[in-house]
Amino acid sequence: IKTLITLSYVVGFDETTLRAGPAGTKRYVLSAVTELYSLFGLGGRDLGSFRDFDILPDFAGIAVHDRYQNYYNEGWTHLAAHQACCSHLLRDFTDAAQAYPDAVWPEQAQRALRGLIHAFNQARDTGQPEITPLVRDPLISSFRHAVRVGLAQVPANPGPRSRTKQPPGRVLLEFCRDRETDVLLFVTDTRIWPTNNISERGLRPTKTQQKISGRLPSEIITQDRLDIRSYIDTMRKHGVDVLTGIRDALTGNPWQPPLPAPT
């Protein structure tokens, strides 16, 4: 499964907290998923854990993720491109709208992004390789204008960037300006998801289990559980009956995902 994920064109990356191991420690479940494969691992949110998860070091496709800085580390310059999760951006613009209730730019940016996502879904559902320029260009222009207005209305606080707290929304606006390609990559290629919802769905059972079971005392057993979940989730994505797949695995005839067709 890990190899097939690293060979994929697009992979979604996400992470969520998990209480595992000794009391007082916080771990993360890391995920790397595609429409056909899922992989979950236990680690931290640091670069070392990202490397040990062993997807990003060998993956050369397009990574879909949130704005977390470690996804933009110089160690991953071999990636083909990034797609920022637009669901996260929409939530961030909601926060900005609450911080600046009289401002127009947060809602304008949201309308533009939602319009592009809707156009993406329509294009993909009808087999189009991209959103047509006639549809996307006005929405992109509206998004850019919203970002420019926001930058003008929310000036940066002076001082060293690493130590100076910025006003609400300023970092978001700078991200959308400086990494516009990462925000809007999906508009010219319908193979690229505009959101990372597929990764968030994959992590949801982990949070549910946490609410039921509480802290998981053994990190080793927790990783074993995540390995099993990776296998079951991948089976499910291939239309394999889960109970049948588990039975076959226990009787020595495990299902294996098919190799991708040569291109």
Q: What kind of region is each of these model predictions?
A:
Residues 1-263:
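Catalytic center-proximal scaffold of phosphoryl-transfer enzymes
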